[in-house]
Amino acid sequence: MLFENTYGIDLGSSSVKVYSFFRNKTYIEKNMIASRGRTIIAMGNEAYDMFEKSPADITVTSPMTFGMIASLELQEIVLYSMIRKIDHILGFGAVMYFTVPLDMTAVEKRAYFHVANGHWLKKNRVFMVEAPVADAIAMGVDLEDPTGNMIVNIGAQSTEVSIITGGKIIISKKIPLGGRQINESVCSEIR
């Protein structure tokens, strides 16, 4: 079983998408975690349901900020719990393909390796796929096509615009403006 423990993973500020090659299915959950002190109460969609409605002693946060990992420990726990729900395995020895921003520093890249090989998940092989390439593949764009393709990815807290042609990313620009800010602007204009 070649793809039994192979996953395509997109860690976003709003949601985590995990594609299981073995099951040929994509799982999507909110990238949120609810805690009381150091005790985790809820994760994923359940934590999102508590967002902005929880008592003062419960904190609901996202381990990602503006498309980058803000809390290694919390992001690893969210990813581990999702993989456990999908395949009921412990997350050892898997192959993980992470979609990552194009303009990452070495420290930010190391964070992805740590998430896949930290306390809960171990001995995993990690590969990074640049987000514009992953987006193009997901949309069915022929990467080797010599014509230019503009790829626009509007995330929760950031937007990335890229031009891909002939299998190469010609130009890419990421701005810290996403769906949340657009929603907030629309709501404030309506009020």
Give the location of each predicted region:
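Nucleotide/phosphate-binding catalytic cleft detector across ATP-hydrolyzing
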Residues: 1-154, 164-191
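Short glycine-rich anion-binding loops that position phosphate/pyrophosphate groups of nucleotides
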Residues: 157
